[in-house]
């Protein structure tokens, strides 16, 4: 009897030791994982496949990629071929692009939904929010309505080549600035700085998005004279560009939106920037991308800008779309944003809302089909 108990204890201890050993091995694998494994990892079974299959297919890379860091997903071998062996010459497929544009327009009237206009809302009208409970509302004030354009800022606009510039750290050292600035229209995301990074990201800006939370994060809600001056000077640099302000995504933006409205009314006529305030556009945009098997809690700003660009651009080139913490060309570590301070740790907070790797894979597939040019290598 005693021998049986001892045997059971020994068995349990053995299982515990094996589990600890596997955990230690996985941690070591994660730390020592070479970045090239991201590209050479074969297509393994789906997450629901038998665990032993994944061990057999390649324990180190699969365990580290699949279970320890969800931001790193196996990238297809075709990406390896294009970036590391023989960069292919991208060819624009106009027929496919026009077909996609038509598909998008069936779900989203981009011109109409690009911005609210004076004629599309009335004073006292209650606006709801795309990503908040229906109980939250924003009342259209006289000041807010006075800031709306008379017609959509992109009405009857057409541009040959457009650049949509994301904020990924892959732009660091890319020398893509001149190429971006040659575009006929440049979309930028989240009021990203350009001057100190112009060699990599360019200076030209025709449209930049402005999430109201930026006012809290970088301009202290305009609480001091210095904060207000800094914001004014930043806006002045935009000259006649469009400032696209998605004020109706979250109810938490309401107070900041009112602060913005007061500021723009106060400085009416002093700035050349064009204001655009989209209404509830996301329900339409989400519907299109859901048909492409992309349905995160929230789409990224970058893919939203691609959606808008499809309506006014004859050809779209993407820069700064890379959601991983290393450069695919040099394998050096990258910051999450190109403008992050040196030494800033790569963040994966976006996982709470976005599906950036899935978005990237879709965009890369579109690149291969000639729908859009996705720049991942250095430009010079």
Curated annotation (Swiss-Prot):
**Chain segments annotated as transmembrane:** 18-33
Q: Which residues are glycosylated?
A: 93, 113, 206
Membrane topology type? Single-pass type II membrane protein
Keywords, alphabetical:
Disulfide bond, Glycoprotein, Glycosyltransferase, Golgi apparatus, Membrane, Signal-anchor, Transferase, Transmembrane, Transmembrane helix
Question: Which Cys pairs does UniProt list as disulfide-bonded?
Answer: 162-313, 176-379
Catalysed transformations (reactions)? a ganglioside GM3 (d18:1(4E)) + CMP-N-acetyl-beta-neuraminate = a ganglioside GD3 (d18:1(4E)) + CMP + H(+); a ganglioside GM3 + CMP-N-acetyl-beta-neuraminate = a ganglioside GD3 + CMP + H(+); an N-acetyl-alpha-neuraminyl-(2->3)-beta-D-galactosyl derivative + CMP-N-acetyl-beta-neuraminate = an N-acetyl-alpha-neuraminyl-(2->8)-N-acetyl-alpha-neuraminyl-(2->3)-beta-D-galactosyl derivative + CMP + H(+); an N-acetyl-alpha-neuraminyl-(2->3)-beta-D-galactosyl-(1->4)-N-acetyl-beta-D-glucosaminyl derivative + CMP-N-acetyl-beta-neuraminate = an alpha-Neu5Ac-(2->8)-alpha-Neu5Ac-(2->3)-beta-D-Gal-(1->4)-beta-D-GlcNAc derivative + CMP + H(+)
Q: What is this protein called?
A: Alpha-N-acetylneuraminate alpha-2,8-sialyltransferase ST8SIA3
Give the species this sequence originates from. Mus musculus
Q: What is the lineage of its organism?
A: Eukaryota, Metazoa, Chordata, Craniata, Vertebrata
Q: Which gene encodes it?
A: St8sia3
């Amino acid at each position: 009897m005693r021998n049986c108990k001892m045997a059971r204890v020994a068995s349990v201890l053995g299982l515990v030791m094996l589990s600890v050993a596997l955990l230690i091995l996985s941690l070591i694998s994660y730390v020592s994982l070479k970045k090239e494994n991201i590209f050479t990892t074969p297509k393994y079974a789906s997450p629901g496949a038998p665990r032993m299959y994944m061990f057999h297919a390649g324990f180190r890379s699969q365990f580290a990629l699949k279970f320890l860091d969800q931001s790193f997903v196996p990238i297809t071998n075709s990406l390896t071929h294009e970036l590391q062996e023989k960069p292919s010459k991208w060819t624009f497929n106009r027929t496919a692009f026009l077909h996609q544009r038509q598909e998008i327009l069936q779900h989203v009237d981009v011109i109409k939904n690009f911005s609210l206009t004076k004629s599309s809302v009335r004073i006292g009208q209650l606006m709801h929010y795309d990503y908040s409970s229906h109980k939250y509302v924003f009342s259209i004030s006289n000041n807010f309505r006075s800031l709306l354009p008379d017609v959509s800022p992109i009405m009857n606009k057409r541009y040959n080549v457009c650049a949509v510039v994301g904020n990924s750290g892959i732009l660091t050292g890319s020398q893509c600035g001149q190429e971006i600035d040659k575009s006929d229209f440049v979309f930028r995301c989240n009021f990203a700085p350009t001057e100190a990074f112009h060699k990599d990201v360019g200076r030209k800006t025709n449209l930049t998005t402005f999430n109201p939370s930026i006012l809290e994060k970088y301009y202290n809600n305009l609480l001091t004279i210095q904060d207000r001056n800094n914001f004014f000077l930043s806006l002045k640099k935009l000259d006649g560009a469009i400032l696209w302000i998605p004020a109706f995504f979250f109810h938490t933006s309401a107070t900041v939106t009112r602060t913005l409205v007061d500021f723009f009314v106060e400085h009416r006529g002093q700035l050349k920037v064009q204001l655009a305030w989209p209404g509830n556009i996301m329900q339409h945009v989400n519907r299109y991308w859901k048909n492409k098997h992309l349905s995160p809690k929230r789409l990224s700003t970058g893919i939203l800008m691609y959606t808008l660009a499809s309506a006014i651009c004859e050809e779209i080139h993407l820069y700064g779309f890379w959601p991983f913490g290393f450069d695919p060309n040099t394998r050096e570590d990258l910051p999450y944003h190109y403008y992050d301070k040196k030494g800033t740790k790569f963040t994966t907070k976006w996982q709470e809302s976005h599906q950036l790797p899935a978005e990237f894979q879709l965009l890369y597939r579109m690149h291969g089909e000639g729908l859009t040019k996705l720049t991942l290598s250095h430009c010079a």
